[in-house]
């Protein structure tokens, strides 16, 4: 009987330790991503600074940019750089909510900027960011493809 009590106590302690460690990792990842968005809002960085060099980025849906980019460089060169080259002001993010679950951080946010043709660009995004050692190792992004594609087709990038 004593052995069972000791075993039960051990299992409960081990489970509690695992739960606390998991909560610590979730909170740490959530803070890292929140800080990156805060920096982006202040024009002193962006969430893309967190991308590991081999991070995969997937844009779901039927947007002109939809697909999976196999690494940071491809994603930045094929999506972010040409996107920013269509804007006359930086995209400013406003985070609605950030959630963390395990190694994944989910961010719901709105972005607004002025396009080079003088029209405003506004969109709502959801990013599902898988984190490891403070870096994004894979991401899935969703946004309004009509707003994104309108900007992409309407405004020629100027580098």
Predicted regions: what they are:
Residues 1-7:
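Bacterial N-terminal signal peptides that target proteins for export
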Residues 11-50, 155-159:
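Short, low-complexity N-terminal intrinsically disordered segments enriched in polar/charged residues
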Residues 22-26, 64-72, 118:
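Alpha-helix initiation/capping motif
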Residues 33, 46-48, 55, 75, ...:
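Hydrophobic pocket/interface hotspot
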Residues 36-43, 50, 54-57, 82-86, ...:
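Structured segments of extracytoplasmic/periplasmic soluble domains
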């Amino acid at each position: 009987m004593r052995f069972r009590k000791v075993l039960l106590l051990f299992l409960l302690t081990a489970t509690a330790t695992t739960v606390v460690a998991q909560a610590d990792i979730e909170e740490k990842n959530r803070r890292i991503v929140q800080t990156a968005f805060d920096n982006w809002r202040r024009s002193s960085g962006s969430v893309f600074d967190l991308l590991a060099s081999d991070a995969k980025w997937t844009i779901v849906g039927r947007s002109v940019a939809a697909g999976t980019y196999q690494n940071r460089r491809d994603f930045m060169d094929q999506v972010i750089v040409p996107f920013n080259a269509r804007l006359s002001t930086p995209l400013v993010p406003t985070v609605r909510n950030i959630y963390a679950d395990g190694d994944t951080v989910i961010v719901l946010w709105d972005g607004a900027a002025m396009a080079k043709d003088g029209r405003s660009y506004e969109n709502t995004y959801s990013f599902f960011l898988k984190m490891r050692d403070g870096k994004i190792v894979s991401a899935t992004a969703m946004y309004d493809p009509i707003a994104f594609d309108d900007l992409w087709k309407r405004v020629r990038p100027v580098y």
